[in-house]
């Protein structure tokens, strides 16, 4: 009886960091028992995906991944939260308020390194401004975390203290979404919102043993801290 009860309860398949690899995603869904019907991957009975963010950048199938994820959400077969790459994309494409007489800039600098990290997404939407705005609009709907009756989900680190700091500035309820003001604050180095989002979406960082120690990440960037 207890086994039958468990089988009838909602179960979740947790999928993170797709990074533009639609073929890998569909292969995984197929292995998990999901089937396509009318262009949407549908879940087995009492199952649902929770996507943990980082849908974009790196891989060659940016639009395809977003199409799969959004279709599953719209039909009730998936939930999704924000990753640091979606947060970075919003900041990259959101103009900052400029002082009179100074040039406009963005919440995330358009530096060489930032452009390189975002290159595949930029290329995918280089001649599709409508599609770009639709993608950004989708990112704005993504909560920073889920706190459901039987499961919690966050992209990197579940940190109650930082979540508490963000609660007054994000959309209330069970879905904690950034509005424009909180996006601006979270993109401003040194603010409580900045530090909170860094931890929730990237994880807690600790310095290496000494200043002399460092390593190169997969993007070739020198790092002196680890998560």
Residue ranges and their predicted role:
Residues 1-9, 137, 181, 222-225:
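Polar low-complexity intrinsically disordered regions
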Residues 45-46, 59-66, 71-202:
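Active-site neighborhood of divalent metal-dependent phosphoester bond hydrolases
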Residues 11, 33, 54, 124, ...:
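Intrinsically disordered, low-complexity N-terminal regions enriched in serine/proline/glycine
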Residues 187-227:
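Low-complexity, serine/threonine/proline-enriched polar segments
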């Amino acid at each position: 009886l207890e086994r039958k009860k468990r089988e009838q309860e909602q179960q979740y398949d947790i999928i993170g960091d797709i990074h533009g690899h639609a073929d890998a995603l569909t292969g995984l869904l197929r292995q998990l028992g999901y089937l396509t019907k009318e262009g949407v991957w549908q879940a087995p009975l009492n199952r649902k995906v929770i996507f943990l963010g980082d849908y974009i950048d790196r891989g060659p199938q940016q639009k395809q991944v977003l199409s799969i994820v959004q279709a599953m959400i719209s039909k009730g077969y998936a939930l999704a939260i924000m990753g640091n790459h979606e947060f970075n994309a919003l900041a990259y494409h959101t103009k900052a308020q400029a002082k009179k007489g100074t040039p406009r800039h963005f919440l995330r600098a358009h530096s060489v390194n930032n452009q390189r990290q975002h290159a595949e997404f930029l290329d995918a939407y280089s001649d599709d401004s409508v599609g770009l705005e639709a993608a950004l609009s989708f990112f704005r709907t993504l909560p920073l975390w889920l706190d459901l009756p039987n499961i919690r989900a966050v992209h990197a680190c579940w940190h109650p203290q930082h979540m508490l700091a963000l609660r007054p500035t994000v959309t209330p309820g069970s879905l904690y979404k950034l509005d424009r003001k909180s996006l601006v604050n979270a993109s401003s180095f040194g603010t409580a919102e900045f530090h909170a989002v860094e931890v929730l979406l990237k994880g807690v960082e600790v310095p290496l043993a000494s200043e002399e120690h460092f390593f190169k990440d997969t993007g070739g960037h020198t790092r002196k801290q680890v998560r």
